[in-house]
Regions:
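Hydrophobic alpha-helical transmembrane segments in multi-pass integral membrane proteins
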Residues: 43-57, 102-118
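Structural signature of hydrophobic alpha-helical transmembrane segments
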Residues: 1-11, 59-71, 100, 125-133
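Mid-bilayer segments of alpha-helical transmembrane spans in multi-pass integral membrane proteins
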Residues: 70-75, 98-115, 136
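Alpha-helical transmembrane-segment detector that highlights a single hydrophobic TM helix
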Residues: 54-82, 93
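N-terminal signal-anchor transmembrane alpha-helix
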Residues: 1-53
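Short, highly charged, low-complexity non-transmembrane loops/tails of multi-pass membrane proteins
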Residues: 149-160
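C-terminal ends of transmembrane helices
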Residues: 14-28, 75-90, 142-146
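Cytoplasmic-side transmembrane-helix entry/capping segments in multi-pass membrane proteins
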Residues: 26-40, 59-64, 88-97
């Protein structure tokens, strides 16, 4: 995949993800992990995640980026509003804090790119796909875990 296509794909997925997260949706949709896992696979398949001329620095940058992606996925998961309706079905919806967390994620990613460029590290676009994919996987898993801990609806009282 060429660099421009990878960037376009990352931006499209980012826009779709933010749009979907800001809408009321059921928790635990079966396909919630499909797109993020595809992003990770595409990013890894591109290869060249490590600059051979600056291997140690590029590995540290990539590792730092992935750690931040995981942390920000968790942060976004905890900004989501989760509730049960009267029938007991779990729902979730993003809040303004979710948008703020996305802005921080984008700015952080840009910061890693700027740090790499200033150090002379040749950056490939595969890492952006892995960053967003991993962050979305962590967020989806954490939202489901939070939802499972949500108290079940009160049992109906049976009158004798």
């Amino acid at each position: 995949m060429n660099e421009q296509l990878a960037i376009l794909l990352a931006l499209a997925v980012l826009a779709l993800s933010i749009y979907r997260q800001m809408r009321t949706r059921p928790v635990g949709e079966g396909r919630a992990l499909v797109l993020p896992l595809v992003l990770i696979a595409l990013g890894a398949a591109q290869g060249h995640l490590v600059d051979g001329d600056h291997a140690a620095l590029s590995i540290w940058l990539l590792a730092g980026e992935l750690v931040v992606g995981v942390v920000l996925g968790l942060v976004r998961a905890y900004t989501m509003r989760i509730w049960r309706d009267e029938s007991g079905r779990l729902w979730r919806r993003g809040t303004p804090w979710t948008i703020a967390a996305w802005i921080v994620a984008i700015a952080t990613r840009a910061g890693f790119v700027a740090a790499g460029i200033s150090a002379g590290v040749a950056l490939e676009t595969g890492s952006i796909l892995i960053f967003f994919g991993l962050s979305l996987v962590v967020q989806a898993v954490a939202v489901v875990a939070r939802a499972r801990s949500t108290a079940p609806p009160a049992a109906a009282t049976v009158k004798a």
